[in-house]
Amino acid sequence: MAYSGAPTIEMPALGRPLRLGMLYDCRSDTLIPGITLWGIEALKKDVETMPKHNTEFQIIASDTIEDKASALRLSSSLKASLLGRLVEVGGSAAFLNDTKKSKYHARVALHYSVTNRFEHLTMSQLGTENVSYPAVFDQGTATHVVTAVLYGAQAFFVFDREVSSSESMREIEGKMKLMIEKIPKVSGGAEVSGEKGNKEEERKENFSCKFYGDFALENNPVTYQDAMGVYSTLPKRLGVAGENAVPVRVWLYPLSKLDSRAAQLVREISAVLVYDAQSALEHLTECDVRCNDMVKDRTATTFPEIQRKIQQFRDLCKQHRQTFQKELARTLPSIRGGGAEEGALVEILTNKEQSPFGTQRLNEFLEKKQEEMDFVNSYLAELGEVEVVSSRSERQCIVLSPRHDFIVSLSLTSLHNEESYLSELNLSLRRQFMKKTHDPALASSACETPKSKQWFEDEEIRRKARQAVKSFSGFARVNKSNGKTRFIVASVPDKDNPGTAIYLYEDGELISTNFEPPSKPRPPLMDGIRHDRVQLTFNPAAYGRAAISGYRAEYRIVGQENWTAVTVNNKQETFTVTGLRANTEYQF
């Protein structure tokens, strides 16, 4: 988008030490220290100062780049430079880099802004005949000069509160907003009506506070009460004559208006491209937040294999973010200075979306990882109080312990499987590095990894896993009081038994990697009924049939409480019960 040639550019100082007469390069949004058009004395002679007193506050109930940029009144162009990390912010503007670390955090920010004076150069300074150092125009390092500065200070109080799964995020944020709106009123001496008592005090205690400001504080506030105390002192901290005020907004005049030899801003970045870059970075932030929550999930902390993969994904995304921002930082000044077209930025954005780091593919990985965690968590819920073992060493201690003759382990066998997508992300980063090092041979060798189905997406594996969990759970319940046998759940890599397998250990030795606990048999069939006997035909369930060593049958006369038990200590599936009373009804 061609530069409109506006006579001046207004922008926030963002904590940077901008002063009247300082040179500025709008192509890279950097200030040029140590080089000026005028001497110090000439600058001081023709500066006009006027009072500009104003105080404002606003509540920011959003954590998006857009709303933060709006609070600081950033232009689209300056926002693009911030996205590419061309601008190092300081003071209150450091608030821009603070994002929520969890989706279970409610966040509301209070923005305080005060101004006290406005300084600007007179028109006599801007005449070419008054320029003390005209060589600046030939150097091409700057495009603009600071001709006006608005002084004051700003502060952001950022309040966070953890929200439990049983609470409403919207409701909590609404209550936080109401309480934070009271701070300027109470600090101003106004009477505020509203909720009183222990409940409100409890809510205040649940807040954490972070402070980003242009004021020098002895101690930063960390609680709601601290914030109220600090807020009430802010007006005095500017000093009696406002001597502690800092630049909050500046106005830049193009050097090309003074001399045509000067470097100039050729074109601006289209707002739609800035928005696309902003969306890409915000999505990476969302992925980071999701990962932060997932690594703390019960399933991830129980099985470190899952946790490690999420952490690896998060680290790869952070590396990609840095690479993407470096590309922006390299390309934006070139476009603005006329050295490249906007198509260069379009190519960067397109390549990102078509790479393994594209929005859809990042979402797919996180959704599948969440699906895997939910799948495993459903096992843990079904198994109730069965002990879960997180490490190999802990499992070995249990297996080798002489306290139990048998260890029956429900083994999750596929949690260690390599993630082809993580390998693909790694390769993508390597390819980008190889291109920078101008090694096409290495770049071409980094081929794309073919997609593969996850273990929990295979219907046959899911079916077998459900059967194994049900069988293991029932077997563990029946044998709960058996002191010779211990039941555990563990993660054990085993490609021969994908998904789940039941391991049986006896006296420290692995006896079976595919143990099928015998299930409760179906009701026996009656045959050969005589006056004093009946033949039972046992009807075992298919699952666990191989592990059956005998049967136990119980019977009683209908109406009586006591049962009589008979045990068959072999695998024969027919047995004759004798000694029954004639003309009597029995229940088996």
What residue ranges belong to the model's regions?
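Elongated, non-catalytic scaffold/linker segments and compositionally distinctive motifs
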Residues: M1-A2, A6, A542, L580-R581
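Membrane-permeabilization and membrane-interfacing ectodomains
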Residues: M1-R336, V388, L442, P450, ...
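Long, low-complexity or tandemly repetitive, helically biased scaffold regions used
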Residues: D259-R466
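Acidic, Ser/Thr/Pro-rich intrinsically disordered regulatory segments
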Residues: L425, I488, Y503-Y505
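Extracellular low-complexity, O-glycosylation-prone stalks/linkers
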Residues: K520-T578, E585-Q587
